[in-house]
């Protein structure tokens, strides 16, 4: 089976009933941030350059698997921080049941202030690379150069390391290496009320049991990143295999890879030898922009407002 047919099989695509779009701008949010982040930073338009804007929230007590309400996708799942990977991949599954997506998904946080011109520029840009260097658009010379490279970008974001990780550089040893990460435990130490929220389904869960995870030194920050149809298919297939259980113990790494969404996405894609391409211009933290006149150099500004 060729790659295109395999991807279409995994993504349940029936082009006779799908809504055709170039891509999806998927903004992950939660019920808590509807009156704050979503209200304050909602994109003015519902579509950019053929890419449809969708906001997703979880509702554990929904009477169906999912439903669309305007530009909102509500999925039947926990609405908690630690379940973000589950929310993301269920969203992908249902989006690919609804839309015939040409390219892929731009996954974004709900606290981003977008430069709409830069956003359209990115969406229209050919998503190819040559040995890790993007070809086409603002980070290369010509579209002809992009076509000459003929290597599709499946996974792109801004890495804190400032580095790419190409498929031939991904080793089994890298994937198997683990660290003890207290990030999620620290978060819940400061948010004890989340354990009492029935929408979060965390009653009796000991977060400290799940601190070991694969070490991911190169990969995108969870602020915003792009995943192609191929990458989305891999994520859906993987989460289907583990029953969307973010507390699943991975025997190969002897760790819990799925509790921190961006790290989990990198782990799954690297396990399938998917290259990661670093892009500095995707976003910048507002606090790091010393000269506010340079704010338009970035596609998005990470405000980090209403964090708590």
Question: Which role fits each region the language model picked out?
Answer:
Residues 1-36:
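N-proximal low-complexity "stem/linker" segments adjacent to membrane-targeting elements
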Residues 40-51:
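Short, acidic, metal-binding catalytic loop of nucleotide-sugar glycosyltransferases
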Residues 43-44, 93-98, 122-125:
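A generic secondary-structure signal
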Residues 56-102:
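Active-site-proximal specificity loops/subdomain of glycosyltransferases
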Residues 101-113:
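Short beta-strand-to-loop acidic/aromatic patch adjacent to the donor-nucleotide binding site
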Residues 113-262:
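Conserved catalytic core of nucleotide-sugar-dependent glycosyltransferases
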Residues 257, 266-282:
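Catalytic donor-sugar/metal-binding loop of nucleotide-sugar-dependent glycosyltransferases
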Residues 290-308:
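C-terminal helix/juxtamembrane-tail motif
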């Amino acid at each position: 089976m060729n790659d295109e047919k395999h991807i279409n099989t995994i993504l349940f695509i029936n082009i006779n009933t799908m809504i055709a779009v170039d891509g999806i701008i998927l903004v992950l949010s939660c019920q808590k941030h509807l009156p704050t982040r979503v209200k304050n930073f909602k994109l003015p338009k519902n579509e950019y350059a053929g890419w449809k804007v969708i906001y997703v929230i979880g509702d554990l007590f929904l009477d169906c698997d999912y439903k669309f309400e305007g530009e909102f996708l509500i999925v039947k799942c926990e609405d908690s921080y630690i379940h973000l990977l589950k929310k993301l991949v269920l969203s992908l599954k249902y989006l690919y049941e609804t839309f015939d997506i040409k390219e892929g998904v731009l996954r974004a946080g709900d606290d981003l202030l977008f430069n709409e011109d830069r956003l359209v520029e990115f969406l229209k840009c050919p998503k190819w690379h040559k040995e890790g260097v993007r070809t086409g658009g603002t980070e290369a010379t010509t579209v002809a150069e992009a076509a000459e490279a003929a290597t599709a970008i499946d996974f792109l974001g801004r890495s804190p390391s400032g580095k790419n990780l190409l498929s031939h550089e991904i080793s089994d040893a890298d994937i198997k290496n683990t660290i003890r990460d207290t990030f999620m435990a620290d978060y819940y130490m400061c948010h004890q009320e989340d354990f009492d929220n029935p929408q979060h389904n965390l009653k009796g869960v000991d977060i400290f049991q799940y601190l070991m995870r694969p070490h991911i030194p190169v990969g995108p920050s969870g602020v915003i990143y792009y995943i192609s149809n191929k990458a989305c298919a891999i994520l859906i297939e993987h989460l289907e295999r583990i029953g969307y259980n973010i507390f699943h113990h991975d025997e190969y790494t002897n760790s819990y890879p799925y509790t921190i969404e961006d790290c989990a996405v990198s782990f799954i894609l690297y396990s399938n030898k998917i290259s990661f391409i670093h892009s500095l211009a995707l976003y910048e933290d507002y606090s790091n922009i010393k000269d506010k006149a340079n704010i338009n150099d970035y596609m998005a500004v990470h405000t980090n407002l209403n964090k708590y």
